[in-house]
Amino acid sequence: MNYRIYSVALALSLLTACGDKPTPLPQPTPTPTPTPAPTPTPEPTPPAYKDYEGYTLIFNQGLASVLTSQPDGVGVASSLSLLDREAKTLLPVFSNKATPLNKEYDGQGYLCEGTLSEAGDYLVYMAKYDFTDDSEHASRLLLFDRRTMRLTKNLRITQPDGDEWVRHSFTFDDGTTYLSFDKKHFYRLNPETGKMTALTGIFGYPTGAASWQDKGYFFVRYESAAFVFDKGSTAARKVPIALSGAQIKEIFRMGAQVILRDTANRYYLFDLATGKVLAVFTLSEPIGRSVTIDPATHRIYYSGGTPNLNGAEAKERSVYTATIDTSRPTSEVQGLTSQLLYTIAGRTEADNRQGFKMQVGYHPDLKALMVSYLDQGRSGPLLHDLTKLLLLQLPTTPSESVKELRTFDLHYASDVSLLSVIRPRPTK
């Protein structure tokens, strides 16, 4: 009996103890940490431009007519237009007719072929042919103020000791111009007096010329080196470039840098300011008529062709691209695989000239490629030359393709040989 009472009492005490234990408070649910929204990549700030900086130069060198074995007149006159910074509007600078910027000048309508380049505050047009006087062979130098696009110097040039046209040239920022004529004659031209001084230390048939800041270069046939002139000098010094056993045979001008091709179909990325080779490479598809470069990435874009014929059919109408690695030693020849980027529609019997004379240029502000080509058939309603200019948006990922942004028709343009964006003057 006592045991039974004790058991009941023990059970009641345990129940009381358990009932007195406090009920645990509910724990607060942790607040999830919000995932921060991704910060959008800021749009690149356009450079602070002034005057015509940021505009694109579109230079049509024109074409001489040939009656027998030598040029005897202007077939298509040279011209220069500007494309505005948004790549929407064309502005003519000079042509065979009066323009808002340059109405009349000596030689107008009688000039064709040659080169256009930048030199300090000048735009330099060296016209190979000046047909204002049929009694002698002459060329002409036109210097434009690149801040206003107005013509400031206009000099007719004849060879002092012969009867040849200017073949290649380069100009320094003071307007001093170095000239090569067809048959191994080289001179320095003073634009203020018109006086020409013979150059020394250079010989051979010229194949190209270029300059940047205070250095100018001539390239001659059968040479593995470049002939260099410092600003103001009349004596050349040689800078070796090509690898042993090869000679430089072709030059592609791209502003501060050029690409040189040697007789073994190797290419050299050459810096004009330093006089140094930055890279040596080969391409699975050779460069045809023109090439341009993105200086930030050293990616090149070029028209296709063949090593010897400088263009053939579909390849001549195509744009290829490849990236040069400038961190590798120049003693190593890089074997680059070219990628097909864009091809103009196939020609037919009616438009068999479509795609000829392709020129390419890179627009660093729009990250776009400019491509021009002759857009005229053998027969049709047009009685003059027509060149098509395309603005192509470059892909940003491997899965994207080139997008055509807009097109322009360049009437009376037979041979566009320069598409280049005017950059602010470099500071030393």
Can you annotate each of these PLM segments?
Residues L14-A17:
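C-terminal motif of bacterial Sec signal peptides marking the signal peptidase cleavage site
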Residues T41-T99:
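An edge-strand/N-cap motif at the start of beta-rich repeat modules
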Residues A48, K103-L116, D161-T171, G201-K215, ...:
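Repeated scaffold domains used in trafficking and secretory/extracellular systems
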Residues E53-Y55, G62, A119-D121, D174-T176, ...:
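Short coil/turn segments that connect the beta-strands within blades of beta-propeller domains
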Residues I58-N60, V66-T68, V124-M126, L179-S180, ...:
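Residue position within the beta-strands of beta-propeller blades
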Residues L63-V66, Q70-G75, Y129-D134, K184-H185, ...:
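Short glycine/acidic-enriched loop and turn motifs that connect beta-strands
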Residues R85-K88, D145-M149, N190-G194, D230-T234, ...:
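Short loop/turn segments that connect beta-strands within beta-propeller blades
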Residues T89-Y105, R150-P160, K195-G201, A235-A242, ...:
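A short beta-strand motif characteristic of beta-propeller blades
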